[in-house]
């Protein structure tokens, strides 16, 4: 039994020993697992660069750097957005405009070439430099808010003179006419060999050209074709217009004085001519006995015409045959236009009496002097389908020289202030069925012309007179709804005498700071102005072609005065480039005035040589 007990005890001891080793084994396994996990965690942390407490200090810096990277990325994206906006909102429309204009010009050019081939001329159509595409015949300044007179002309700029001048002391160049289309410009003037009052014989200079930009960015007018019509015909009072076939011109042919013409019983001969792109000139006499059967005298308006709806429109004026249908239709009709804030003090009945008499001045034998507009179909045949429009005198004043203009989609008739009303007039013109309808005019109170008493620049009451001078305004500033706000022009700033030419921008009441041609005693006469834009630089320029007194070579010299239109609220007067301060070493101040009659020739010669030597 003791043996059995011992055997049981031994087995118990062995079982306890086994349990002990199992526990040790399990503990060892657990410890090794924990150690393995710790080592694995450490290795994993090391491999993933996990942050330690000391690393947390750099978190704000890291966040700041991340913020900078994000901001930089967003900035880059904004740059991309800005570039996209510029491309979509600015560059693409301009590119489309240029493309449209280029296609239009290409089609027009092709049409000209086809016409040229049909006429065996072999000559293509000229086109302005691309810098001017979209900048000719457009509303150049659209501004609802700014004061019109905050725009003003710069000093006169030097550019290529495209107008021939007299070459003798007795020569005379007068009556400039200018018109510019989207493709080319046309210019003409009269050339008289012996003084400016000769009515028996003269030449007519006619030129066709384009606008160019020099390598330095300067504007210049490049004459491509020109002709001097020196024949037995005495063309006078010519108006020119740029058309798709070249330069169309309307002239009267006269051999007598204006007063004698008004006293005659038959209309004045008229001719429709054209200088083609090939440099050839052709013309055709109009059937004035039918077209002007109610007229005793008829003349083009001197100012440029305009190409509208496949027809060329010219201003016309002259004398009506007494008691003819056209004269009877105007009987008793009149209009009175009033000065701004300067009412005529005469009794209303007397004003009406004088207004009616103003259409029949004594100078022309009491004939009714009438305004009119002549339109002619533009085709290879000259003088085709002429139609004469005679507007009612309930709208127009006494007939006078004028100009037909197109700016944007608007058409205007300028009428010279030959009657009592001094401020410049622009009648809105509506074209339909080959005829024109005029409406009450825009008036520009500060844009006056000199005149004889009682129709001087300050006149405010109706009177009968034939006076004034041709100084047309060019529509420059518009409202967004296309209503005209302001014009540019060169006026003669004197009450009675043709003196003191100045350029300015005008609203209905006042004018901007001015740019003088020279001194206030400078003699001048006709001026005609045209504005355009260099689209590439967005700069607006205006050209005033002016007759300036020139005592050395002829009585007048026709000068193309070029200005840039600027904008600010500066002083009221600017001098021409002749008087502007230039770089040190240049001495422009000795040439005073531009066209001077030097009294001391020796001293003048010395100063002139010094002046020439001072230029770099």
UniProtKB/Swiss-Prot annotation:
Region (Important for interaction with fusion/F protein): 124-152
Stretch list, region Involved in neuraminidase activity: 234-239
GO cellular component: host cell plasma membrane; membrane; viral envelope; virion membrane
Pfam family name, one: HN
Family statement drawn from the similarity comment of this UniProt entry: Belongs to the paramyxoviruses hemagglutinin-neuraminidase family.
Subunit structure, as described in the record: Homotetramer; composed of disulfide-linked homodimers. Interacts with F protein trimer. Interacts with host CG-1B; this interaction inhibits viral adsorption and replication rather than internalization.
Protein name per UniProt: Hemagglutinin-neuraminidase
Organism encoding this protein: Newcastle disease virus (strain Queensland/66)
